[in-house]
UniProtKB/Swiss-Prot annotation:
Protein name: Uncharacterized protein YpuD
Domain of life: Bacteria
Organism placement in taxonomy: Bacteria, Bacillati, Bacillota, Bacilli, Bacillales
Length: 114
């Protein structure tokens, strides 16, 4: 029984050395190894263009905002089918735009918590 454990330990060490050598030869860092969370975040970033705005005016269900670079936005909460009642004037928001649709490409809006 002791010989089997020793052989398994030696095989695991050799496997780790082989994997480490492969990563070294191919210049792969541990941070480059994909994870489920990393893939989800990167795929979300690839699907959307994200822009931050500060809400400057609320007129009924119509929200007006401006980005730090001066870009303005007007969006309608009803059109987004999203409850935006927690967003007030002066709040910062993230606007998610579709990369494929440039006109009417606003997908969703999320409040940024400072």
């Amino acid at each position: 029984m002791g010989r089997i454990k020793t052989k398994i330990t030696i095989l695991l060490v050799l496997l780790l050395l082989l994997a480490g050598g492969y990563m070294y030869i191919n210049d792969i860092e541990l941070k480059d190894v994909p994870t489920a969370i990393g893939q989800t975040l990167s795929s979300e970033e690839e699907e959307y263009t994200i822009q931050e705005y500060k809400v400057t005016k609320i007129d009924g269900s119509e929200y007006h905002g401006v980005a730090e670079n001066g870009t303005k936005i007007i969006f309608n909460g009803k059109k987004l089918n999203q409850d935006l009642s927690d967003i007030k004037e002066g709040d910062k928001i993230k606007a998610y735009f579709s990369k494929s649709k440039r006109i009417d490409g606003l997908i969703k809006v999320a409040k940024v918590n400072d």
